[in-house]
Amino acid sequence: MKQKGKMSGKKLKQMFVTYTFVLPDFIGLLVFIIIPIIYSFYMSLYDWNFANIKQFIGIQNYVTMFSDSEWWQSLGRTFKLTLLYVPALFILSILFAVLINYVKNEKAAGFVKTAFLLPYSITSVIASCLWMFLYMDRSGFINVFLKAFGLKGEKFLGSTSQAMVCIAVVLIWINLGYNIILFLSAIKDIPYSYYEAAKLDGANSWQTFWKITFPLLKPTSVFVLITSVIASFQCLDLIMVMTGGG
């Protein structure tokens, strides 16, 4: 009986420690995600005016939204941006992570990682302003560069298709470094014995990547894909600054 009591007490202590570590993340999730979502849904059921007078209208706001053709057009453009941005970011992130992993000089590897991660530390609005100077019709750096070689300048933000590509480039520039760090950490966690066994079996670098590295990156890949899709739906500030919402 004493042994059983000790075991149950030990188990309770382990559970307490576990929940103590989880509690801060749960509080953050509750305060910054769950409660705002619930409150936003509550607000969507009312008609609000500037006098802060509300009138309950049920799901009328959702009916209005789904019957608006502009909303469907905006949603379609968002999906196009997602299909353009997410695969490109995913491929580039893995590619650069693998290449950096081959760099033996720690200082050089650290410099490269810092250079890639730096854009992630600035806000989307600042990043948008920086890239707007590059995309400007006449004095933008890209057009100046093109004209220096006798090429015709482009109105990069002047059409929907070109603007979408430009926005995707900015999103990739911002988030590439963060995803590289994630993939690089996952690659370094792969036991080196796997690669030694593959080398003994005569596998080349391409076969090693497809048979060992890429499959073992699945958890990180899923996380990166999910966060990338979310990011493509949360870039309104970037779009408003660069295109004015058009």
Describe every region a protein language model picked out:
Residues 1-13:
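Short, Lys/Arg-rich, polar N-terminal cytosolic tail immediately upstream
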Residues 10-246:
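A structural signal for multi-pass alpha-helical bundles of membrane permease subunits
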